[in-house]
Amino acid sequence: MSRLKKLYTEEIRKTLQDKFQYENVMQIPVLKKIVISMGLAEAAKDKNLFQAHLEELAVISGQKPLVTRAKNSIAGFKLREGQGIGAKVTLRGIRMYDFMDRFCNIVSPRIRDFRGFSCKGDGRGCYSLGLDDQQIFPEVDLDRVKRSQGMNITWVTTAQTDAECLTLLECMGLRFKKAQ
């Protein structure tokens, strides 16, 4: 069992139960999945660069990324139908908890001038953030990075409100900006 999963079952569930006064234990929010995605439209023209970014995402996440492809051709963007324009990985189970643990304890402190993430969710119990650079992950070999590439990370929970979601993620170790 992962360290974060053990922390969730032993402490975080009790904290959430006390704070939000759930009637049933099944109402307590759970982290369902983490989705990591990269938009690689510029890299789509250069196959070597596209492949390098796919390998970086695989190293960061621990599993092979799914290539997202263009649905339609758009001549103005020099885009062809079926051309790879991005990549995404969906983490569940032990890999999800391991990634969350690494992200909170190793990656977040490496962000320059980090004072916490924004406190704005989507209103439905999910939280998303964007990173400007993949080089903050210690798994990425800095000598092999050809171009800086950002990514989006989305935490999907069973929470009904933003407050529940943010409390769950904060208890798991994600740092948010203090509201003024």
Swiss-Prot record:
GO molecular function, one term: rRNA binding
One GO term (biological process): translation
TM region positions: none
Gene Ontology, cellular component aspect: ribonucleoprotein complex; ribosome
Gene3D superfamilies assigned: 3.30.1440.10
Origin: domain of life: Bacteria
Family: Belongs to the universal ribosomal protein uL5 family.
Protein name: Large ribosomal subunit protein uL5
Organism from which the protein derives: Chlamydia trachomatis serovar L2 (strain ATCC VR-902B / DSM 19102 / 434/Bu)
Taxonomic lineage from the root: Bacteria, Pseudomonadati, Chlamydiota, Chlamydiia, Chlamydiales
Gene that encodes the chain: rplE
